[in-house]
Design a protein with these regions (language model features):
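Detector for C-terminal structural segments
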Residues: 54, 209, 218, 283, ...
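Gly/Pro-rich hinge or "lid" segments in bacterial periplasmic/extracellular proteins
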Residues: 68-69, 162-227, 346-347, 351
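Aromatic- and charge-enriched surface segment that lines or borders ligand/interaction sites
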Residues: 80-124, 139, 145-147, 243-246, ...
Length: 526
């Protein structure tokens, strides 16, 4: 009966898609994408999920950017040039003078200042990324200077993020926005920016119906090359099977969240192209370091036992991808490869649990979002975690939650033990330090404090933040990864494979390690 209901629901959803969007693919200028939406906001100062980054990359511009195909160099975007002070603490950007916002307003240094200060003061989910900026100042209409507390080699990479989008200050202020120090309490522009965009990207956000669809329209005032598609429609399809069926039927152009098995089922279909490759994402178990929240899982010995209990090869069989050496994404600068990955050892896990006083087993409640991302079902992985830990006497109760509720508990550090997915905020190894105190994931989300670390590790963290020479950085990040393999409240267990598929007449598809998908470079064969 349950299977019948599932099949009926699938065909009902496909019928709805066809009735609403069925003519879209017949019109060459409309792009339809199936995805599992995971955003809670499109306001650049508040939204901080993969869905947010994809949409805001299309609707906003930043001072600098990466090439379309990779993250190999920093390129000008709204800034046509920049200078760095001798001590590495002041970055001065000269703005291009032909760029305008979607409503036709000129982009000025004051807009840059407003956008950065609002990001800092709004205290939204991504605001921490601007913590390392002491001040931002408009020198004149076309020149803006950032002052940092200390030299930071990753700064230019950081500000490529859609979090640092330049917003139209006048439009945002007219709708309740402010960059004042009390913006967290007084700014009311969130609803406005979640329903439309105030940027200068190739598209404009026209409509967002949470957990249903997001619609973009072409920005006719775009200062760069006009995109091919007049309209882009993202349809929320939480199940990869639904995306696969819609793609095969020709009802969508691109299926963004497919499992390796689902992609394999599309092989040989001449109407469909397939992309596979390693992602920059990491699935991990997080154990709160406050005992009143996670109980025995605040104990470092128990945390290590959990790491030894997980069946790393099993997750690779389920979803493809690779086993991470640490939370740093496999394949990046200094990241441990599979040759240094953590290995399962059930005897060691049981020995550690006995050492911690739990030879007879213990109970765990595992919190996680009830969602699918990249074709990976969090429920399926959670059930696998449950089965793995049962083999060493840890009885796991699964607590799936609605994405917004689960995110709030995770981000506020109120969770006990959780299962989450993480991707880099910036394409620099410094981002790995988010998993070490006082990094955001470690401390704000998991209450792991800097003073709990040995002094030599604290010193390494401080040195890694300012090191610029490749050999020095390599040595520091290698040592820090060695430490976190054996210590700390995280158990990273899989870097999943990117598996997407699209209609063969869709041209220009590139999976990008930073913004994942750039709809502005796509076109359709005539």
């Amino acid at each position: 009966m349950n299977r019948f209901k599932h099949v009926l629901l699938l065909f009902t959803l496909l019928a709805l898609i066809l009735s609403v969007f069925g003519t879209a693919l017949a019109e060459d200028k409309i792009l339809v994408i199936g995805w599992s939406e995971n955003t809670d906001a499109y306001d650049p100062a508040n939204g901080f999920t993969h869905s947010t980054h994809i949409v805001n990359h299309a609707t906003y511009s930043q001072l600098v950017t990466f090439p379309d195909e990779d993250a190999s160099q920093i390129l000008p975007q709204l800034a046509e040039s920049w200078e760095i002070s001798a001590d590495g603490t002041v970055y001065t950007f000269s703005l291009r003078q032909d760029a305008t916002f979607a409503n036709g307003d000129d982009i000025t240094a004051d807009d840059v200042v407003f956008s950065i200060q609002r990001l800092q003061n709004y205290n939204g989910n991504p605001s921490f990324l601007a913590d390392g900026i002491d001040s931002v100042e408009a020198i004149d209409d076309d020149t803006v200077a950032f002052t940092l507390p200390a030299a930071r080699p990753s700064f230019l990479s950081e500000i490529t993020s859609a979090v640092f989008s330049v917003t139209n200050a006048d439009a945002v202020m007219a709708n309740g926005g402010t960059d004042a120090m009390d913006a967290a309490e007084t700014d009311t522009a969130g609803a406005y920016l979640d329903s439309t965009s105030a940027g200068s990207g190739p598209y404009v956000l026209e409509n967002w119906e949470p957990q249903n669809r997001t619609e973009l329209v072409r920005n006719e005032n775009y200062w760069g090359d006009q995109p091919y598609f007049d309209r882009v429609i993202f349809i929320h399809m939480p199940e990869g099977a639904t995306q696969k069926a819609a793609l095969e039927a020709g009802d969508i152009d691109l299926a963004f969240d497919l499992s390796p098995d689902q992609v394999a089922g599309l092989e040989g279909n001449e109407a469909i192209e397939i992309y596979r490759g390693p992602s920059t994402l990491t699935h991990f178990v997080i154990m709160n370091t406050e005992e009143e929240k996670s109980g025995p899982f605040a104990n470092p010995t128990v945390q290590l036992a959990v790491r030894y209990a997980l069946d790393y090869e099993g997750y690779k069989t389920l979803w493809g991808g690779v086993t991470p050496g640490t939370n740093m994404w496999v394949g990046f600068f200094s990241a441990f490869g599979e040759d240094r990955a953590f290995s399962r050892d059930l005897d060691k896990a049981r020995e550690l649990l006995a050492e911690a006083g739990y030879a007879d087993g213990l109970e765990m409640e595992l919190e996680y979002p009830d969602m699918v991302y990249g074709g990976v079902s969090f429920n399926t992985n959670a059930q696998k975690i449950q089965a793995d830990l049962a083999e060493v006497g840890i009885n796991v109760t699964l607590l799936p939650g609605e994405i917004q509720v689960a995110l709030e508990r995770y981000r506020s550090g109120e969770h006990g033990v959780g299962y989450w997915l993480w991707g880099p905020d910036i394409l620099d190894p410094l981002d790995f330090l988010s998993f070490m105190p006082p990094g955001k994931v470690a401390t704000e989300r998991n209450n792991w404090q800097l003073d709990s670390l040995p002094q030599d590790i604290q010193d390494m963290i401080a040195a890694a933040k300012v090191a610029s020479e490749p050999d020095e950085r390599m040595a520091l990040f290698t040592a820090l990864q060695e430490y976190t393999q054996q210590n700390g409240p995280f158990a990273p267990f899989n870097v999943p494979e990117v598996a997407t598929a699209y209609r063969s007449n869709l041209q220009g598809y590139i999976w990008h390690p930073h913004w994942l998908l750039d709809v502005a470079i796509l076109s359709r064969a005539e």
